[in-house]
């Protein structure tokens, strides 16, 4: 469950290391985002030679949450921390690699690129 001011790790090689959620997209008073939701983030910590610079604002898709996601069979998939993948204006990932596992809930038309780049899909 991601809300405003939640800090997330970045799960790609875009150059950002840590981002902060500044808005949950998808409704005027929407409070929480879960896996597969798009949020607006600002870069809080970045590597010196990356594409993403500190202070820049991007859209990002949430790929892992500590809260987890419940499946129809009753099982629940949870992670140790929260992570996101930065997106460009067209909704495509900025990085060319994804680090760590992602969930099957991302298998929509919009995020198939992220699923195909991920080393493991849970």
From Swiss-Prot:
Entry-linked InterPro entries: Ribosomal_uL14, Ribosomal_uL14_bac-type, Ribosomal_uL14_CS, Ribosomal_uL14_sf
Family annotation (CDD domains): Ribosomal_uL14
Gene3D superfamilies, sorted: Ribosomal protein L14
SUPFAM superfamilies, per the entry: Ribosomal protein L14
Alphabetized UniProt keyword annotations: Ribonucleoprotein, Ribosomal protein, RNA-binding, rRNA-binding
Pfam families assigned to the protein according to its UniProt record, in alphabetical order: Ribosomal_L14
GO biological process, one term: translation
GO CC terms: cytosolic large ribosomal subunit
An MF annotation (GO) of this entry: large ribosomal subunit rRNA binding
Alphabetized SMART domains for the sequence: Ribosomal_L14
Family the UniProt entry places it in: Belongs to the universal ribosomal protein uL14 family.
Oligomeric and partner information: Part of the 50S ribosomal subunit. Forms a cluster with proteins L3 and L19. In the 70S ribosome, L14 and L19 interact and together make contacts with the 16S rRNA in bridges B5 and B8.
Biological role stated in the UniProt entry: Binds to 23S rRNA. Forms part of two intersubunit bridges in the 70S ribosome.
Name of this chain's protein: Large ribosomal subunit protein uL14
Organism name: Francisella tularensis subsp. holarctica (strain LVS)
């Amino acid at each position: 469950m991601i809300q405003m001011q939640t800090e997330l790790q970045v799960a790609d090689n875009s150059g950002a290391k840590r981002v902060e959620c500044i808005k949950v997209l998808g409704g005027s008073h929407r409070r929480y985002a879960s896996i597969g939701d798009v949020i607006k983030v600002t870069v809080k910590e970045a590597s010196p030679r990356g594409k993403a610079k500190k202070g820049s604002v991007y859209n990002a898709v949430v790929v892992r949450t500590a809260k987890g996601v419940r499946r129809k069979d009753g099982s629940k998939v949870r992670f140790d921390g929260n992570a996101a993948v930065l997106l460009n204006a067209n909704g495509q990932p900025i990085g060319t690699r994804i680090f760590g596992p992602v969930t099957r809930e991302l298998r929509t038309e919009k995020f198939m690129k992220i699923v195909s780049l991920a080393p493991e899909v849970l």
